[in-house]
């Protein structure tokens, strides 16, 4: 989806207009060269000579500044012309890969900022205002959903209490008549209550949770230790790229190094495959492997504890409230991933929906702003370095001036994409593909980035016969990704409201 439309003809026309303006300015400057640098002394006295020299120096400085402005103007016009040509070439080339587009866009923005120092600050203000407006619009359409659902639930509980009281008043004589029998039944039920059994069950469940915690912590520590050599090697590669000036690649490898340490792979054993004609349907529930997956497993223990004690309660309003509390814990700690894909091999048409639990989306949002800001700093550093190597010192100064704005814009409004490959075995006989490859292009978003879908590249690695049209990049439906602000203000409260909403 394209959010910006650029007309190369308009850019070229603007460059022509600026060139004409530049010619006029140069003519005016040349005409003023004599009068501003060749002032004659009014008299032969010392004061007149000093005044004449003073104005002469100012005239020379005026000519120097005029020459600098002319050089800046020429460079700006040249940049506009190059930009128009670049847009024409880009449109005719029909785009590229998503990360390449983002990286190229960042470089283009930095190059434009080098030609017009300070422009990045205006872009920062515009992007921030747009995202804040989007954030407020989404919130105002559904303000405080979790709080409103809590209030709605209390109203339901009071209605149930009122109905129970009305029933008791209406049937009061019968209740009084049956009171001795009810008391006797309650006493018998209390005497028959097997407290030892439930105590044993509670102790066993707590031991099980403790064992799960200890085992998971051990697995996480083991995974970190095992992945440390690879982390060191990848960090060394990133450092070498930093030394040679490939700053964006260094940042990308830094992100991959940390990702590979925390996520060592996916358990794709939970897969359901279906075929109908030339259409293949795949439902996969991959599980994260590695320290991050172990951390998510530990996070689910409180929700399991709450569900266990909720199940011990008899049907009542108190149990409903306990179940709602359990649902909140489950929503906040559920790390599940579910991918549903459908592909028609004959037409190469298909859909892909991926649903992520709140912990995973929250993890990406937490890391998103620092990583996007770091990537913006790397882009500015490359722009400065390239300008210096080309002898474009004015461009280098402009990029240096705009670097803080780019860094803050990345922290607030930008996104940096890292690829996450998932290989799902199909178990299908030949000549059908044995594996479906799903490479998710997951974004690290700035704090204010509004919800947006992600994309993925679908391929069939190891297929006996190449499948026309693959690999292909598709838009992924399902859980959107976003920055921390819309996640905390809108998305998570909406998910919690759904978690405690009574079933229809």
Curated annotation (Swiss-Prot):
Keyword set includes Secreted: yes
Keyword vocabulary terms for this entry: Cell wall, Secreted, Virulence
Any one Gene Ontology cellular component term annotated for this protein: extracellular region
SUPFAM superfamilies: PE/PPE dimer-like (SSF140459)
Gene3D superfamilies xref list: HP0062-like domain (1.10.287.850)
Entry's localization field: Secreted, Cell wall
Residue ranges constituting the PE domain according to the UniProt record: 4-94
Description of how the protein assembles with itself and partners: Interacts with host Toll-like receptor 2 (TLR2).
The protein, known as: PE-PGRS family protein PE_PGRS62
Organism: Mycobacterium tuberculosis (strain ATCC 25618 / H37Rv)
């Amino acid at each position: 989806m394209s959010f910006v439309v650029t007309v190369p003809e308009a850019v070229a026309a603007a460059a022509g207009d600026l060139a004409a303006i530049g010619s006029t300015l140069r003519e005016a400057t040349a005409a003023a060269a004599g009068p501003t640098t060749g002032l004659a002394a009014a008299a032969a006295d010392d004061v007149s000579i000093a005044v004449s020299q003073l104005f002469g120096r100012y005239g020379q400085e005026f000519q120097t500044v005029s020459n600098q402005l002319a050089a800046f103007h020429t460079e700006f016009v040249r940049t506009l012309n190059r930009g128009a040509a670049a847009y024409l070439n880009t449109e005719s080339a029909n785009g590229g890969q998503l990360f390449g587009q983002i990286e190229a866009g960042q470089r283009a923005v930095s190059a434009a900022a080098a030609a017009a120092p300070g422009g990045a600050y205006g872009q920062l203000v515009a992007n921030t205002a747009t995202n804040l407006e989007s954030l407020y619009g989404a919130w105002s359409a559904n303000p405080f959903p979790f709080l409103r659902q809590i209030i709605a639930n209390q109203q339901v509980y009071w209605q149930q209490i009122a109905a129970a009281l009305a029933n008791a008043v209406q049937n009061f004589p019968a209740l009084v008549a049956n009171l001795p029998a009810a008391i006797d039944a309650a006493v018998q039920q209390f005497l028959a209550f097997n407290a030892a059994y439930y105590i044993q069950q509670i102790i066993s469940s707590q031991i099980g949770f403790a064992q799960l915690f200890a085992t998971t912590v051990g697995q996480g520590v083991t995974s970190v230790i095992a992945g440390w050599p690879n982390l060191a090697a990848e960090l060394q590669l990133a450092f070498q790229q930093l030394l040679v000036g490939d700053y964006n690649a260094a940042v990308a490898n830094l992100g991959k190094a940390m990702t590979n340490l925390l996520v060592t792979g996916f358990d794709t054993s939970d897969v359901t495959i279906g075929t109908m004609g030339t259409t293949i349907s795949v439902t996969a529930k991959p599980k994260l492997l590695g320290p991050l997956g172990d951390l998510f497993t530990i996070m689910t223990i409180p929700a399991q504890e709450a569900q266990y004690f909720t199940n011990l309660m008899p049907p009542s309003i108190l149990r409903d409230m306990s179940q709602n509390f359990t649902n909140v814990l489950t929503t906040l700690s559920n790390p599940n991933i579910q991918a549903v894909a459908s592909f028609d091999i004959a037409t190469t048409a298909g859909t892909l929906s991926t649903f992520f639990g709140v912990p995973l989306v929250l993890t990406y949002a937490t890391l998103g702003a620092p990583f996007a800001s770091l990537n913006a700093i790397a882009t500015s550093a490359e722009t400065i370095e390239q300008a210096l190597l080309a002898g474009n010192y004015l461009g280098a100064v402009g990029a240096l001036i705009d670097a803080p704005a780019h860094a803050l814009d990345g922290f607030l409004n930008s996104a940096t994409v890292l690829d996450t490959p998932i290989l799902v075995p199909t178990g299908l006989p030949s000549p059908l593909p044995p594996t479906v490859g799903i490479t998710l292009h997951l974004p690290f978003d700035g704090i204010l980035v509004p919800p947006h879908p992600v994309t993925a590249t679908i391929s069939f690695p190891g297929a006996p016969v190449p499948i026309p049209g693959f690999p292909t990049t598709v838009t992924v439906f399902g859980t959107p990704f976003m920055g921390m602000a819309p996640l905390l203000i809108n998305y998570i409260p909406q998910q919690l409201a759904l978690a405690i909403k009574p079933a229809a």
